[in-house]
């Protein structure tokens, strides 16, 4: 059987931002562990991190699993050299140009598929053109879906029934019809449609709108989720999609590192703190005594909001780890005077990239203040850690509803309005401090921890042999082997 698997060659095309690329690379590792040949299509500045991460479990003498590097179209898109990931952009205008660059990868992808002749292509949902290009060579294209079944079900219900049109105010709640649970939202919380009429904005519009179509036109969709987490919504999604639905749930993919400490610390960019120092700090703390605060790779709060967060962390008198984007350059504009001296020993500030899975998995972590990105949400669930939910953009308000209303393992901080990565709701330190205390002390959090612990157990069971996600990955590989025999020849 292993010999047959080696004959199957799977190509991967990750979208170039950590929230999308990291889980896809976890998926690559899962395929490698099953003996499948893999090739990752990427660009020069992204290649070193990919190579480092995948080589953690690879035999360095083997060339079965490779990286195909194509030049990044910086000049053509109007980007400066060195910007090859969305989280490296520094303005909305630069972000839009980055999406132009993503669209300009169509011809290089065509060349890649023609040269490497993989048996299938797994491409991020943000590359709708991948389906047509792969089809030219008789290659089935799979979508790697970067959200869960619950947020996808919410989007489908909103698009089908348009309940948001029944309210007169952006702040009036409405019930999302047809879902298994009573889910209420406001217009202010809805994911914004990316619309553009000309120029740079058109590329973003095409990619985002095409992402929805890709779910219908691709060979199938791979979800980073597991059945036991959201069974009602797996069923809702597949029933709504009907015959068009070929779905595999193979998550949580981050658990590919569950037996590799170096894998937990090596995901994404090089961490801004050593694994040793991070664990040494955490090992000195009691179980469930530390709050972890991180808002993902794209969130940019105002100086005023950062100051409120700092004040809340100091006043709540709990141990904390706070991940800040970037260095100390502008901290004098908002960091309370003497803050670091006053919280020394109590607070650990990580400036830059943090080994999030390593941190969340530590028994000292008692709560996670999160933007509710799907990866962070799933990683917290996999670690059995309750959350303080602070959604900002994308589908994060939908993920918050899953955490707080369905799974009941989170406390809302009070974010109410969708925005472009900056946080439209300005929250005072009193509100933040209240949520921090709710997630760390009292009877309510004890019940949350019990539920979170049960979800962690379910997550681990799902990826072990015989579990739902393990079995779905086996089914996916078997389907690839079966389809390989009938693929068109070059």
Swiss-Prot record:
Q: How is it used?
A: Soapwort saponins possess anticancer properties and are also being explored as enhancers for endosomal escape in targeted tumor therapies. They may also serve as precursors for vaccine adjuvants.
The name of this protein is UDP-glucosyl transferase 73M2
So where does UDP get bound?
A: 297, 353-354, 371, 375-376, 379, 393
Looking up InterPro entries in the UniProt record yields: UDP_glucos_trans (IPR002213), UDP_glycos_trans_CS (IPR035595)
Q: What class of enzyme is it?
A: transferase
Expression across tissues is:
Mainly expressed in flowers, flower buds and young leaves, and, to a lesser extent, in old leaves, stems and roots.
| Presence of keyword Ribosomal protein | no
Active site at: 20, 124
Q: Which gene encodes it?
A: UGT73M2
Annotated GO biological processes are:
glycosylation; saponin biosynthetic process; triterpenoid biosynthetic process
Q: Name one Pfam family in it.
A: UDPGT
Q: Name one GO molecular function term.
A: UDP-glycosyltransferase activity
Summarizing the function annotation, the protein's role is: Component of the oleanane-type triterpene saponins (e.g. saponarioside A and saponarioside B) biosynthetic pathway, leading to the production of natural products with detergent properties used as traditional sources of soap.
Q: Which UniProt keywords apply?
A: Glycosyltransferase, Transferase
Q: Which family does it belong to?
A: Belongs to the UDP-glycosyltransferase family.
Superkingdom of origin: Eukaryota
Q: In which pathway does it act?
A: Secondary metabolite biosynthesis; terpenoid biosynthesis
Q: What is its EC number?
A: 2.4.1.-
- SUPFAM superfamilies, alphabetically? UDP-Glycosyltransferase/glycogen phosphorylase
């Amino acid at each position: 059987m292993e010999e047959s698997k080696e004959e199957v060659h799977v190509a991967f095309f990750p979208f170039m931002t950590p929230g999308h690329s990291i889980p896809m690379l976890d998926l690559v590792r899962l395929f490698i562990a099953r003996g499948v040949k893999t090739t990752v299509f990427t660009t020069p500045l992204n290649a070193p991190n990919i190579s480092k991460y995948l080589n953690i479990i690879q035999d360095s003498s083997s060339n079965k699993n490779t990286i195909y590097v194509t030049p990044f179209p910086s000049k053509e898109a109007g980007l400066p050299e060195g910007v090859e990931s969305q989280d490296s952009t520094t303005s909305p205008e630069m972000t839009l140009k980055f999406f132009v660059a993503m669209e300009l990868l169509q011809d290089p992808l065509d060349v890649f598929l023609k040269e490497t002749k993989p048996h299938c292509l797994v491409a991020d949902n943000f590359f709708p053109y991948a389906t047509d290009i792969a089809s030219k060579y008789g290659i089935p294209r799979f979508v790697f879906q970067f959200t869960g079944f619950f947020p996808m079900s919410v989007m489908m219900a909103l698009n089908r029934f348009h309940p948001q049109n029944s309210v007169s105010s952006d702040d009036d709640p409405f019930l999302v019809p047809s879902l298994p649970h009573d889910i209420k939202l406001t217009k202010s919380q809805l994911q914004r449609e990316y619309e553009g009429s000309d120029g740079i904005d058109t590329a973003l519009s095409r990619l985002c709108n095409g992402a929805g179509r890709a779910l219908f036109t691709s060979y199938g969709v791979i979800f980073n989720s597991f059945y036991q987490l959201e069974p009602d919504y797996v069923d809702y999604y597949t029933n709504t999609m009907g015959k068009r639905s070929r779905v595999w749930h193979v998550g949580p993919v981050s658990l590919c590192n569950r037996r590799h400490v170096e894998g937990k610390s090596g995901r994404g960019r090089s961490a801004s703190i050593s694994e040793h120092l991070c664990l040494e700090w955490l090992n000195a703390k009691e179980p469930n005594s530390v709050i972890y605060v991180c808002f993902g790779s794209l969130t940019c709060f105002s100086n005023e909001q950062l100051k409120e967060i700092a004040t809340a962390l100091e006043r709540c008198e709990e141990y904390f780890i706070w991940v800040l984007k970037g260095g100390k350059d502008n901290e004098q504009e908002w960091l309370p005077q003497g803050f670091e001296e006053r919280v020394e020993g109590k607070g650990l500030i990580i400036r830059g990239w943090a080994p999030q899975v390593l941190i969340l998995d530590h028994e000292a972590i008692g709560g996670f203040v999160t933007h509710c990105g799907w990866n962070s949400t799933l990683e917290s669930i996999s670690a059995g850690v309750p959350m303080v939910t602070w959604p900002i953009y994308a589908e994060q308000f939908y993920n918050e509803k899953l955490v707080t209303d369905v799974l009941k393992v989170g406390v809302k901080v009070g974010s109410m309005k969708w925005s472009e990565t900056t946080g439209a709701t300005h929250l005072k330190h009193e509100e933040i401090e209240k949520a921090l205390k709710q997630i760390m002390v009292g009877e309510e959090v004890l019940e949350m921890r019990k539920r979170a612990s049960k979800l962690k157990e379910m997550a681990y069971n799902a990826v072990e042999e015989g579990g739902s996600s393990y079995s779905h990955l086996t089914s996916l590989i078997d389907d690839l082997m079966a389809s390989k025999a009938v693929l068109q020849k070059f």
